[in-house]
UniProtKB/Swiss-Prot annotation:
Quaternary context: Forms a cyclic heterotetrameric complex composed of two molecules of XerC and two molecules of XerD.
Single GO MF descriptor: DNA binding
Keywords: Cell cycle, Cell division, Chromosome partition, Cytoplasm, DNA integration, DNA recombination, DNA-binding
Biological source species: Corynebacterium efficiens (strain DSM 44549 / YS-314 / AJ 12310 / JCM 11189 / NBRC 100395)
Biological role: Site-specific tyrosine recombinase, which acts by catalyzing the cutting and rejoining of the recombining DNA molecules. The XerC-XerD complex is essential to convert dimers of the bacterial chromosome into monomers to permit their segregation at cell division. It also contributes to the segregational stability of plasmids.
Active site: R165, K189, H256, R259, H282, Y291 (o-(3'-phospho-dna)-tyrosine intermediate)
Location in or out of the cell: Cytoplasm
Entry annotated with the keyword Mitochondrion: no
Domain (Core-binding (CB)): residue spans on this chain: 22-103
Pfam families named among the record's database cross-references: Phage_int_SAM_1, Phage_integrase
Name under which the protein is recorded: Tyrosine recombinase XerC
Every Tyr recombinase domain range: 124-304
Record NCBIfam families: PRK00283.1
């Protein structure tokens, strides 16, 4: 985790000369510390907030100028620059959260940012594999050595079986897996812990990998290691998925697609939405509900292809 107070450098190396800018930057860093230490936000989330707020501070350097007209003008320039609706929505959310915190801490008198309207962002339905495709994909792992093949197969099976995030898989330790109960302990966003079940295919793949692990590993605890023996990272997992997708003929498939696929297949099989929410580690049921739309679309496509009256 990034230490509190980290990253207190100036914007583009120039901010901080003006005392007003220094006050704004200090407030932004205090807010980021609050997000890390009190709210428990992830490093990646806090980096996003910091980036958006420093961008804002380059235009609105003084807390006394943190007003609704100035904020609208700042966002308006982003529109003129052709920024996406997703970027505008994220920047709006960042300044609104900062504003609420600043009011509570007496840095500004009124929460003018609360009146900002966030643009609606159209969420694309995630790419998912069909059940037959998923089976073919799991059987398409390819690697330079037998040990790497066993590792790659275990990674793919576990991602598909559990729907866990890539970052969560990278953080797995040997002690996190209960092989007898076929359960894995995952540390998710905000350091929230959850237990996820997995099936026989993943269990068999893990057993095969663990027989080979000690020949590759140079660290004691990490469940999965890279070619140099250290804990595996997200970039290496991306390469594993890319290589497998190429063999399987599954274009444009990302590691996150396996998470989408797991969730969709659970719902297709009749799993309860809240159970899937818990399994995926979503804080909001609304996030999980997007997979019900995927299942509905798949059902509609199957109907159109198979029903004589479609």
């Amino acid at each position: 985790m990034e230490p509190a107070g980290a990253g207190r450098e100036g914007w583009d190396g120039t901010m901080g000369d003006d005392p007003r800018q220094s006050q704004m930057l200090e407030a932004i860093e205090d807010f980021c510390d609050y997000l890390i230490l009190v709210v428990g936000r992830s490093d990646a989330t806090v980096r996003g907030y910091r980036s958006d707020l420093r961008h804002m501070a380059a235009t609105i350097p003084d807390l006394t100028e943190f007003t609704l007209p100035n904020l609208r003008a700042w966002l308006g320039r982003a529109v003129e620059e052709g920024k996406s609706r997703a970027t505008l929505a994220r920047r709006t959310a960042s300044v609104k959260s900062f504003s609420t915190w600043a009011v509570k801490n007496g840095l500004i008198s009124g929460d003018e940012a609360a009146r900002l309207v966030s643009p609606k962002v159209t969420r694309n339905l995630p790419r998912v594999l069909g059940e037959v495709q998923a089976g073919e994909f799991m059987g398409s792992a390819a690697a330079d050595t037998e040990d790497e093949f066993r590792r790659d197969s275990a990674i793919l099976e576990l991602l598909y079986a559990t729907g866990m995030r890539v970052s969560e898989l990278c953080g797995l330790d040997l002690g996190d897996v209960d092989h007898h109960r076929r359960m894995v302990r995952v540390l998710g966003k905000g350091d929230k812990e959850r237990m996820i079940p997995f099936g026989k295919a993943a269990a068999d793949a893990l057993e095969q990998w663990l027989e080979a692990r000690d020949r590759m590993a140079k660290v004691e605890d990490a469940m999965f290691v890279g070619v140099r023996g250290g804990r595996i990272d997200a970039r290496q997992i991306r390469r594993i998925v890319d290589r497998t997708a190429q063999v399987a003929g599954a274009d444009h498939l990302s590691p996150h697609s396996l998470r989408h696929t797991a969730a969709t297949h659970l719902l297709d099989g009749g799993a309860d939405l809240r159970q899937v929410q818990e399994m995926l580690g979503h804080s909001s049921l609304q996030t999980t509900q997007i997979y019900t739309h995927v299942s509905s679309q798949r059902l509609l496509e199957a109907f159109r292809q198979a029903h004589p009256r479609a």
